[in-house]
């Protein structure tokens, strides 16, 4: 979110990645919430928010070399594959949105005691626009300390 606001403040406007990611960026800016977008084509086990563990590695977006994570960093994981580190701040090359992407996960970061209402409003608006504009089928969830994982079939 910081990079988007900085880009706009410098007069560079919104970046165009693809229409679905652009929509996510617009919702992210509207609600001032960090949000990512991940291709789920290789994900079969669901997504979880957890602390990194010994042996976890991370392939940075645009990178070619895996980084070894220290224990205790907040990550989004698909099984043992780390999709983001430092919440949604650093996205992995795994899950890059491509023109043929058809299954997308949009993590929206927030805090239950601080901005839960905004997170839920952003989630609901994004879902409705994905349906109305793109004709998408959607599945939504809300992950927190009591519900750290989302599984689908």
Model-derived regions, located:
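Non-transmembrane, aqueous-exposed alpha-helical and coiled segments at domain scale
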Residues: 1-153
């Amino acid at each position: 979110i910081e990079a988007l606001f900085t880009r706009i403040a410098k007069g560079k406007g919104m970046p165009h990645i693809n229409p679905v990611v652009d929509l996510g960026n617009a919702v992210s800016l509207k609600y001032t919430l960090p949000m990512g977008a991940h291709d789920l084509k290789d994900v079969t086990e669901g997504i979880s928010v957890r602390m990194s563990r010994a042996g976890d590695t991370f392939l940075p977006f645009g990178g070619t070399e895996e980084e070894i994570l220290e224990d205790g960093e907040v990550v989004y994981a698909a099984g043992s594959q780390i999709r983001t580190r430092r919440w949604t701040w650093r996205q992995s090359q795994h899950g890059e949105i491509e023109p043929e992407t058809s299954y997308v996960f949009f993590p929206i970061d927030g805090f239950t005691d601080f901005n839960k209402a905004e997170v839920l409003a952003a989630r609901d608006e994004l879902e409705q626009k994905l349906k109305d504009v793109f004709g998408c089928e959607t599945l939504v969830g809300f992950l927190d300390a009591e519900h750290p994982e989302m599984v689908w079939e």
